[in-house]
Amino acid sequence: MRVAPRPVGDIAQELGGDVVGSAQALVDHIAGIENAGAGALTFLSNRRYVPHLATTQATAVLVHPGIEPVPNGPTLIRVTDPYAAFARVLAWMYPRHRPSAGVHPRAVVADDAVVDGVFVDALAVVGAGAIIGAGSWIEPGVVVGAGARIGVDAHLMANAVVAPGCTLGDRVVLNPGAVVGGDGFGFAPTATGHEKIPQRGSATLADDVEVGSNSCIDRSALPGTTTTVGPGSKLDNLVQVGHGATLGRGVRMVAYSGVAGSSTLGDHVTLAAKAAVLGHRTIGDGVAVGAASVVHDAQPDGARVTGIPAINHRTWLRAATAFSELPNVLRALRDLRRRVKALEEARDHE
């Protein structure tokens, strides 16, 4: 989709970047570097794609400072972080326009709920005593439970749920179907079955948290406690945060990953797809957990772990390499056994 053309020089100025080429060149859309045409702005953040500078038809490319232009190639905008700059430009060129404040006639808003300056769309429900900050956007089918608190400029997409008594900070985004504050998985085994443990705590999402579609952050079990997701954390689709868990600042959880109840993740922890942290574990700051790994033990700051159970990533790589050699090792071992047996038999007949 094309938009009003903008000079490359203006974009570079807003990004704090330097232009190599024509600052007057106009861009009117964004595209990938491999299929970009005239008028396109694209980006190059991975140096493996540098050869594409010689073939792309893009008008301008966001690049790292060390990237050199090619003859007859596109104009370059040198910035510190091309990927982040690309995200900013994408938001400028294709803004998501929020509707004006108001309550749709088919929405249900409790008389004592506070929704001043909020747009509440059709079939949304806002419970008694709930407070939603100005500039927030509540899409169709959203349920905000009684006594919930939501900060300013939040965006709750279709069919998201904020359960009673839960709290969302400013600029929180819940994608479609996300649930904050559902009951945690708590059952006491008995002779006759499983006795449900009432979940009477809450769930709290700090400022600038985004939760993907159909992800769940369960409420904690005990009154006065809360499951917490720290500022700026980003949760992908189909992510599970168990009751009473605590996530620090800037945590990233990729699709299908999960944190079991009462575990603590430090700041800037990354869980790759399908990674899991068992309950009552403490994970230090900056830890990265590889895809499909299971963390059984506490991890120190900065650890890089992979596997089941998760171990040091480099150790796991060596083990994985050794595992692929097992068929050859077994064949060599069988051959060695035959040779030893033959030698023993020859000795016995001497």
Write out the residue ranges for each language-model feature.
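Terminal amphipathic alpha-helical/low-complexity segments used for targeting or macromolecular assembly
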Residues: 1-106, 171, 177-178, 182-196, ...
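Structural signal for interior beta-strand "rungs" in well-ordered beta-sheet cores
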Residues: 43, 102-312
